[in-house]
């Protein structure tokens, strides 16, 4: 099992953003059933956010506090990671000591003492503030025992090294999927491997493109209707999507060859390539979806199959940015 800050976690975590960061929040009963199921299956690395809500922005943490109030015995079984340091309205990163301190204290307040804040990380690195300054502010909370450890999100290899000089880094969260393999080339994977820092892979299905539900332009249109925020992402532009269809077909063919569904293949590629050091955190809002995601653990890719997959996928050019031109500047800083 992977280990984060000395805590044993399952090979697949649980992203909680979708439970609350949408116009219609997931019903509490449904959310609790999902969380209980995930935990019962060993999916105990939970990824939350201080700003993962609409009204209020803190709905994600409020949900967690309610959950652990109802199921207090589960608090010590879950490793809770919380992202913050972000402006609620603009989502701009704020890494200055005052903002970071306010963010951590707010997260602790919202959790109402029902669950320890195991890991806190700023959602993005603030390019206006030296990362050493941000890390010193967070280190104070580790030293006081108010949080257990510090993580990084969307940090470059250089920033990881600089942050580590100030405080131990328990995990680095970054986008990683068959569609977004940047960390294999930009030094992040190598750096984390050398420093034995686990990587938390968000968006392992590339925001839905690798679920098998989006194969045609018509599928894309319906998918965007269900998830309007995707309109702003390059890969969901119809013209860009058309260019990526050959890649999607290659993924589907590989999945079939290895006896897996597309989501199972997407997750097993990450797990196999991580060798116990990369933990994907697919989001779920239902027990059925979590069950489908965790079914990937019943299968695996051999080292030979992994290399075969890489050779096939490397032949295809991937079109479109990870997000869009405006947001790309906030990634891997």
UniProtKB/Swiss-Prot annotation:
Subcellular location: Cytoplasm
Record keywords: Cytoplasm, NADP, Oxidoreductase
EC assignment: 1.1.1.65
Principal cellular location given in the protein's record: cytoplasm
The keyword Ubl conjugation appears for this protein: no
GO CC entries: cytoplasm; nucleus
GO BP: pyridoxal biosynthetic process
Highest rank taxon of the organism: Eukaryota
Residue ranges that the Swiss-Prot or TrEMBL entry lists as coiled coil: none
Catalysis: reaction(s): pyridoxine + NADP(+) = pyridoxal + NADPH + H(+)
InterPro entries for this protein: Aldo-Keto_reductase, NADP_OxRdtase_dom, NADP_OxRdtase_dom_sf
Principal EC category: oxidoreductase
Pfam families: Aldo_ket_red
Active site: 52 (proton donor)
A single GO molecular function term of this UniProt record: aldo-keto reductase (NADPH) activity
Family designation: Belongs to the aldo/keto reductase family.
Function: Catalyzes the reduction of pyridoxal (PL) with NADPH and oxidation of pyridoxine (PN) with NADP(+).
Name of the molecule in the record: Probable pyridoxal reductase 2
Lineage: Eukaryota, Fungi, Dikarya, Ascomycota, Taphrinomycotina
């Amino acid at each position: 099992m992977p280990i984060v800050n000395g805590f044993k976690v399952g090979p697949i975590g649980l992203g909680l953003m979708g439970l609350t960061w949408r116009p219609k929040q997931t019903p509490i009963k449904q959310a609790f059933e999902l969380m209980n199921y995930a935990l019962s299956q060993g999916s105990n690395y939970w990824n939350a956010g201080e700003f993962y809500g609409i009204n209020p922005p803190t709905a994600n943490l409020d949900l967690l506090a309610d959950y652990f109030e109802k199921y207090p015995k589960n608090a010590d079984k879950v490793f809770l990671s919380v992202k913050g340091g972000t402006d609620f309205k603009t989502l701009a990163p704020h890494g200055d000591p005052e903002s970071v301190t306010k963010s951590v204290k707010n997260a602790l307040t919202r959790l109402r003492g029902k669950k320890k804040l195991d890991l806190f990380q700023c959602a993005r690195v603030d390019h206006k503030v030296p990362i050493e300054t941000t890390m010193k502010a967070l280190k104070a909370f580790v030293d006081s025992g108010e949080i257990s450890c510090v993580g990084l999100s969307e940090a470059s290899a250089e920033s990881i090294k600089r942050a580590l000089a100030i405080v131990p880094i328990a995990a680095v969260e970054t986008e990683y999927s068959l569609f977004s393999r940047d960390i294999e080339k930009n030094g992040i994977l190598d750096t984390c491997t050398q420093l034995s820092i686990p990587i938390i892979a968000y968006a392992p299905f590339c925001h839905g493109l690798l679920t098998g539900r989006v194969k045609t332009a018509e599928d894309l249109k319906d998918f965007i209707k269900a998830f309007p925020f995707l309109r702003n992402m390059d890969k969901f532009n119809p013209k860009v999507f058309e260019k990526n269809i050959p890649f999607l077909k290659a993924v589907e063919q590989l999945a079939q060859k290895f006896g897996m569904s597309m989501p199972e293949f997407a997750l097993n590629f990450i797990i196999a390539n991580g060798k116990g050091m990369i933990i994907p955190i697919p989001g779920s809002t239902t027990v059925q979806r979590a069950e489908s995601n965790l079914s990937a653990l019943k299968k695996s890719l051999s080292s030979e199959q992994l290399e075969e997959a890489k050779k096939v996928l490397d032949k295809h050019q991937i079109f479109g940015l990870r997000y869009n031109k405006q947001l790309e500047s906030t990634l891997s800083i």
